[in-house]
């Protein structure tokens, strides 16, 4: 793997140790070759993270094949998959920092090989989330109905693109007719304005 420059900077700047618990049902004989190959790539990428980190990165691998281990994996947010024979198997991770036990563990419920282009991003996002006590705030200004609202007596959801942002940021709707920003302004403004209007 050749890591992105941003990833390298983030890893070099780590100030606290990171523990990555990798749950992989590698002993299950029914796992297909594509999953096994992808597992090798995930482990290789985690090894690169470990090698380049400015603080210790511990990788602990477990193979949850007993019912109790599988139940514990599900309780920690991992998403079970089912083989053609009806057996559960897992391939995900829980990321924590021993120095920051009060912080919410970050879970990657399932490593899907179809999402490989986003693998590095998913790991970086999970590690970065450990250090934030509060998500950064983004103000959203738009005359379009981009945020959750009620129309025709129905609740209309937030636009999909903004829902994706909400996984890492707190979005604050700002009235486009307001003459000034709120007293506690967000650190970033997102102005959504269609070009043709």
Segments and roles (model prediction):
Residues 1-197:
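Short, surface-exposed patches at the edges or C-terminal ends of soluble domains, predominantly
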């Amino acid at each position: 793997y050749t890591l992105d420059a941003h990833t390298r900077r983030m890893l070099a700047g780590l100030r606290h140790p990171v523990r990555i618990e990798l749950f992989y049902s590698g002993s299950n004989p029914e796992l297909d070759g594509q999953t096994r190959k992808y597992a090798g790539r995930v482990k290789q990428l985690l090894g690169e993270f470990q090698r380049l980190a400015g603080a210790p990165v511990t990788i602990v691998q477990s193979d949850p094949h007993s019912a109790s281990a599988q139940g514990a994996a599900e309780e920690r947010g991992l998403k079970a998959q089912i083989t053609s024979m009806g057996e559960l198997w897992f391939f995900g991770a829980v990321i924590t920092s021993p120095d920051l036990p009060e912080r919410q563990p970050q879970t990657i419920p399932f490593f899907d090989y179809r999402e490989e282009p986003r693998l590095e991003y998913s790991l970086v996002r999970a590690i970065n989330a450990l250090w934030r006590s509060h998500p950064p705030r983004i103000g959203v200004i738009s005359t379009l109905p981009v945020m959750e609202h009620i129309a025709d007596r129905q609740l209309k959801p937030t636009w999909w693109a903004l829902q994706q942002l909400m996984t890492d940021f707190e979005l604050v709707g700002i009235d486009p007719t307001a003459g000034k920003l709120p007293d506690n302004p967000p650190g970033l403004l997102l102005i959504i304005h269609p070009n043709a209007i």
